[in-house]
Amino acid sequence: MTLAPKDLSNLLGIMSEDACSSSFEQLSSAFHHCFGKAEHFGVGSVLVMLLQQPDLLPSAPQRLTALYLLWEMYRTEPLAANPFAAVFAHLLNPSSAAEEQEKTLSGFLPPITLPEKFFLSQLMLAPPRELFKKTPRQVSCMDITSTPQTIDISGLQLALAERQSELPTQSKASFPSLLSDPDPDSSNSGFDSSVANQITESLVTGPRPPLESHFRPEFIRPTPPLLVCEDELCWLNPCEPEHRVQWDRSMCVRNGTGVEIKRIMAKAFKSPLSAAQQTQLLGELEKDLKLVYHIGLTPAKLPDLVENNPLVAIEMLLKLMSSSQITEYFSVLVNMDMSLHSMEVVNRLTTAVDLPPEFIHLYISNCISTCEQIKDKYMQNRLVRLVCVFLQSLIRNKIINVQDLFIEVQAFCIEFSRIREAAGLFRLLKTLDNGETPAEGKTSK
């Protein structure tokens, strides 16, 4: 944050009383001519320090110049991304008299005048170009009593609070080492700019300038004593160690059952299992409830298991209900290609456990979308019949609230009304919409 003496001289020249007769556009051109983007943060830190010290920056036009430059350096970025946005929030946020007294003793920003507040609020909104054609001296003399300007900075304050919450606790408890004099000189000797510039140079230049120092809690731990203390804890080292190897008798013992189950499971992902293999696999899963986590089933392999062995997939999903990955398994299941086996798995799961409604709704939407997009008429008719039977089962068993999908399902039935099952589903929807109870087990004709 340190500045070279030449850079500080250029900055103080832009901030001088004489420069306050130049327009804001001219001040901006002079500033960007002297300082590059890499120097903006260091220059901004010096400007904030000057704003905190009324005896170094006493006049309103100079403060207006400082506020304008803090905004101008980061005007192309969002306001919350400006590292000095907290300065704007502090100056625009009104404080009580007691808080103002506390701030003057804590090195915070002193209050600003109404024209300064008006100018700052214009910067935070969409400032008109005519405003930058004025000079700081003209803005400081504006009469704004007839045009009060209030803006909502709650969004900015929230963003600043989130940024501050990420800081270390020690940093949040620190404050600058440069404090304003609470009892300024009352000799009325006037402001001497040369003296103020010398003081500013001593504060911000040099290898370790006071601007970079601050006060914060230091957690200093005492050095442990070199001599033995009374009642000191003694560390005992055995003088005659006796090491005995503790053998794990079960280690390296071949587990034939586990190997066989993994072999069957690997086959289940590729082809249907025989009845004997299914019985053996499900029997071992019943004996050891944790076996399901160690035989190779992952969310990515679930579609292969569903297509080749839907009954095994159902039993394994039921045993994985307490797993932290069950949401991933459900997501893969409802997004896989629609088929008779996937419908069978979803239907059995809905009757066995309470699936999240959003997963069921997503699966129904995917089924309807698949039926609408398929080109083969024979396959389309077959899938539509499957979907209609599946939906009737869900509705009659009261697993879904049909009102949540009424419009989508009704449009599906109308589109495929030529198919008998779709017409039956449509009549069931109308029956429910009229408040009637559908007859259990009634077959649509």
Curated annotation (Swiss-Prot):
Lyase listed as a keyword: no
Keyword DNA repair: no
Pfam families: CNOT11
Compositionally biased intervals (Low complexity): 174-193
Keywords for this protein: Cytoplasm, Nucleus, RNA-mediated gene silencing, Transcription, Transcription regulation, Translation regulation
Primary location group: cytoplasm
Region feature Disordered, mapped onto this chain: 169-193
BP GO annotations: regulation of translation; regulatory ncRNA-mediated gene silencing
Chain's role: Component of the CCR4-NOT complex which is one of the major cellular mRNA deadenylases and is linked to various cellular processes including bulk mRNA degradation, miRNA-mediated repression, translational repression during translational initiation and general transcription regulation. Additional complex functions may be a consequence of its influence on mRNA expression. Is required for the association of cnot10 with the CCR4-NOT complex. Seems not to be required for complex deadenylase function.
Assembly, per entry: Component of the CCR4-NOT complex. cnot10 and cnot11 form a subcomplex docked to the cnot1 scaffold.
Entries under PANTHER family matching the protein: CCR4-NOT TRANSCRIPTION COMPLEX SUBUNIT 11
Record's protein name: CCR4-NOT transcription complex subunit 11
Name of the gene: cnot11
